[in-house]
């Protein structure tokens, strides 16, 4: 007497006829307009919560400074590992010149935008 595996395998001893009915308490979310509008509102609220605020200008400038220092650090490593035996003072001066050139390049690109 089971219907697709639902219900009793045998009505014997259950005090019922074993007839399987559709559950009227079940509601299909796709067909019920009351539930779909509520679900859409919840999705919109979740999307609004996931939107990230605009970044602060200080954070952006800090990241730019870190990128510049990374380039200068790589340049310093290249000078220190190079075949020329340069003193620390000359390496420092070359790194300062390189840093200035990068900063001037960034300022020129900002002024063009």
From Swiss-Prot:
Record note on quaternary structure: Associates with the NTC complex (or PRP19-associated complex). The NTC complex associates with the spliceosome after the release of the U1 and U4 snRNAs and forms the CWC spliceosome subcomplex reminiscent of a late-stage spliceosome.
UniProt record, GO biological process: mRNA processing; RNA splicing
Family: Belongs to the CWC21 family.
Region listing for Disordered, in residue ranges: 1-61
Amino acid composition bias (Basic and acidic residues), ranges on this chain: 29-42
SS bonds (residue pairs): none
Compartment(s) where it occurs, according to its Swiss-Prot or TrEMBL record: Cytoplasm; Nucleus
Gene transcribed to yield this protein: CWC21
Biased composition (Low complexity): 43-52
Name of the protein in its database record: Pre-mRNA-splicing factor CWC21
Function: Involved in pre-mRNA splicing. May function at or prior to the first catalytic step of splicing at the catalytic center of the spliceosome. May do so by stabilizing the catalytic center or the position of the RNA substrate.
